[in-house]
Amino acid sequence: VDEEQGVKPLEVVAAVIRDAQGRVLVAQRPIDKHQGGKWEFPGGKVEQGESRRSALGRELNEELGIEISSSKRLISIYHEYEDKSIYLDVYEVNHWGGEPSGCEGQPVKWVEVDELKTLDFPDANAPIIDAVCLPKLLKYLKPVATDGAFREQVNQSLEDGHKLLFHNYEEQPISHEQLNWLLDTAAEKKAEVVFQSPPPLVRNDYGIHLNHEALVKAHEKPAAQRVSASCYNPGELFKAQRLGVDFIILEPVLMNLFSTGHEALGWPMFQSLAARVNIPVYASGGVSEKDLELAREYGAQGIASTSLS
């Protein structure tokens, strides 16, 4: 197949390699290559007859001189440039042998996760950076009866290490004082809060979640620190992608939602739907923390649930 004519997308694999400090390894593309001079996540083309994980191991050995011992799926992306289209399969690598270096003369460096958004990457890498920055677990805050129980739940969630909390304001309205306390307390732990149907706020350090009705009505991405959306079908997934949301919650995966009439998707259908968009997708509906590794193999960013320790 003539890749230059765009007959078939170029299959590419890439690795998000993290060290013990949580830093990520990036490499600079040669000036004479496509998107030359920009930073990238190490990887390369999948050869004919080669599995993607085999290609990943080969490329990292050739480029960096390391032998990877394990990898986990992070995100898959389809992107069209003016001169070619690519299908990019991205894996997280946390365990390897050897010391990474630029074996082909390319500059490489370790960067903090927060620094990734300041570097010049090819356009196709934007969803990868989003996926790297997002946690694997999204914690739904449960409706509770008292202010004390509300604060206890928030404090416990943050103490457990959760970095992304979800509060449904429609389901449990809270006072402005509680709302500001929630955001301040989360910020102290470097965590984010996403609200569904929040009241008008004078601050901007929070996220907005679009439920089904809000997604259908939306004509542009709301102004917020982060925007997410709930989706049940391909049409809603594509609408969320057109709006440019930062992540999607796709449901229900393992349980029927009788209140909305939606039947459980199951993991194969979840994988098929999630693969249609270039956005991190969380699995929700009947799933818990024990399903995390399975969810990731099926293409999920992670799990969204109340059932998280």
Which residues fall in each region the model found?
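Catalytic cores of alpha/beta
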Residues: 193-208, 232-244, 276-283, 287-306
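Glycine-rich phosphate-binding active-site loops on the catalytic face of alpha/beta enzymes
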Residues: 212-220, 247-261, 287-309
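Nudix hydrolase/Nudix homology domain
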Residues: 38, 101-153, 160-162
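Conserved Nudix-box catalytic region and its N-terminal flanking loop in Nudix hydrolases
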Residues: 23-63, 194
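Active-site-adjacent beta-strand/loop module that shapes the phosphate/pyrophosphate-binding cleft
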Residues: 77-99, 109
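Conserved N-terminal beta-strand and adjoining loop/helix that marks the start
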Residues: 2-24, 76
